[in-house]
Amino acid sequence: MNKPKKVAILTAGGLAPCLNSAIGSLIERYTEIDPSIEIICYRGGYKGLLLGDSYPVTAEVRKKAGVLQRFGGSVIGNSRVKLTNVKDCVKRGLVKEGEDPQKVAADQLVKDGVDILHTIGGDDTNTAAADLAAFLARNNYGLTVIGLPKTVDNDVFPIKQSLGAWTAAEQGARYFMNVVAENNANPRMLIVHEVMGRNCGWLTAATAQEYRKLLDRAEWLPELGLTRESYEVHAVFVPEMAIDLEAEAKRLREVMDKVDCVNIFVSEGAGVEAIVAEMQAKGQEVPRDAFGHIKLDAVNPGKWFGEQFAQMIGAEKTLVQKSGYFARASASNVDDMRLIKSCADLAVECAFRRESGVIGHDEDNGNVLRAIEFPRIKGGKPFNIDTDWFNSMLSEIGQPKGGKVEVSH
């Protein structure tokens, strides 16, 4: 075993209900094995690494690290920084003109005496970590980078289950359980529940499934109008499945006529190509982030779907609600805590072996929990619409299954 002298932890990208739990789990595991190993946490993700801004993990922090399990978010802070996007790093004042952000980051790790870097983030964070690991190896820095995969989308190849996704689905279901009662406030109400998921419908589908489990456990009073039908999910739209707007409008109008409301779950990535084409045709700029991704909050797919359907189904009022920030900023649930603990424990074990990679259940190797090689990590894993539970749900809510759509990342 090659004992690390100093370990650094950073979180990056958007939030997911696992970050604090993962930070706490890593600190606790290192402390259990050898409390003499120094730990620092870079403030604000890769931004903190570039600027040399970090928190020391003191004895008091080690003692109370378990407190982090109770809170959502990331106490050490996140940022969206791509080390290979030199222009953006210069523009944001993170490096000087002419500097290579990867070299600045590597030199800062050396300056801080770090020999193990733990990155906790999604596909962008871990591809950035992969680039940094390759740079370190090419230039003989002798540092090990170990990633933990967080994303509410559950869309990272070849990882079976990303950290935080189960919790996000559960929290999105809880969110809509309150919102859905708004159908009492107005006749012929259309409620659109927009769920996070850039190019992957897993979270939308899983949120709908978790929500329907809540309905399964509920008690109803149809004699006074409290029916499951009015609380039901009437349609689920994901990027990987084609949508026949006219046919769906006809079906949903029948639901509206019968139940007096329609509840739609839609992925924020569904219909984006059509929306972007519409924006470009009008000469409008399509906003993008540092990684080149379309800023979905500016594109507003839920609003677009609401506008498409409202007139066709005869809605008197349309309500569009987004559960994304509510869900992603939650503390981890029990299932995720268990997954996070097992991944963090293996990450520490890999640190002692100086084994780089992203910790996860490898779908290409029998779903074994291991350090997956960085070059094999990539985003954009689509949701499999042929999954049994998804097909059963579509059948139960009376929604015809659309054809498969190839989604781009």
Curated annotation (Swiss-Prot):
EC number(s) from the headed UniProt entry: 2.7.1.90
Subcellular location as annotated: Cytoplasm
- The kind of enzyme this is, by top-level EC class, is transferase
State the needed cofactors, names only: Mg(2+)
Give the pH-dependence text from the record: Optimum pH is 8.0.
- Which positions are annotated as binding substrate? 151-153, 196-198, 268, 325-328
Q: Name the Gene Ontology molecular function terms of this record.
A: 6-phosphofructokinase activity; diphosphate-fructose-6-phosphate 1-phosphotransferase activity; metal ion binding
The keyword Kinase is assigned to this record: yes
| One GO CC annotation | cytoplasm
Question: Where is the catalytic site?
Answer: 153 (proton acceptor)
Q: Which GO terms describe its biological process?
A: fructose 6-phosphate metabolic process
Keyword 4Fe-4S belongs to the record: no
Specify which residues bind diphosphate according to the UniProt entry for this protein: 14
UniProt pathway annotation: Carbohydrate degradation; glycolysis; D-glyceraldehyde 3-phosphate and glycerone phosphate from D-glucose: step 3/4
Please give the chief subcellular localization of this protein. cytoplasm
Q: Which UniProt keywords apply?
A: Cytoplasm, Glycolysis, Kinase, Magnesium, Metal-binding, Transferase
Give the positions of the site Important for catalytic activity and substrate specificity: 124
Control of this protein's activity is summarized as: Non-allosteric.
Catalytic activity reported: beta-D-fructose 6-phosphate + diphosphate = beta-D-fructose 1,6-bisphosphate + phosphate + H(+)
Sum up the protein's function in the record's words.
Answer: Catalyzes the phosphorylation of D-fructose 6-phosphate, the first committing step of glycolysis. Uses inorganic phosphate (PPi) as phosphoryl donor instead of ATP like common ATP-dependent phosphofructokinases (ATP-PFKs), which renders the reaction reversible, and can thus function both in glycolysis and gluconeogenesis. Consistently, PPi-PFK can replace the enzymes of both the forward (ATP-PFK) and reverse (fructose-bisphosphatase (FBPase)) reactions.
Q: How does it assemble?
A: Homodimer.
- Similarity field: Belongs to the phosphofructokinase type A (PFKA) family. PPi-dependent PFK group II subfamily. Clade 'P' sub-subfamily.
* Entry protein name: Pyrophosphate--fructose 6-phosphate 1-phosphotransferase
Organism name: Methylomonas methanica
